[in-house]
Amino acid sequence: MAVPKKKTSRARRDRRRSHHALRGPGMVACPNCGEMRLPHRVCPECGYYKGRTVVAVEAVE
């Protein structure tokens, strides 16, 4: 079994982990209403996808 010969320093450990950060989802603007949404998905605000209404969304008053 492989065992480290020396203790890994905090600097070396943190340098290795510098690329482990998570990124937020890539959002795009809806061409119909302008709200931000996930790509390749129906807009939750207006219900449009690829230029047509896919889901009927009720207006909140």
From Swiss-Prot:
Residues 1-24 are annotated as: Disordered. Residues 1-22 have a biased composition (Basic residues). One of its GO terms (cellular component) is large ribosomal subunit. Keywords: Ribonucleoprotein, Ribosomal protein. It comes from the Bacteria. NCBIfam families: rpmF_bact. Belongs to the bacterial ribosomal protein bL32 family. This is Large ribosomal subunit protein bL32. The gene is rpmF.
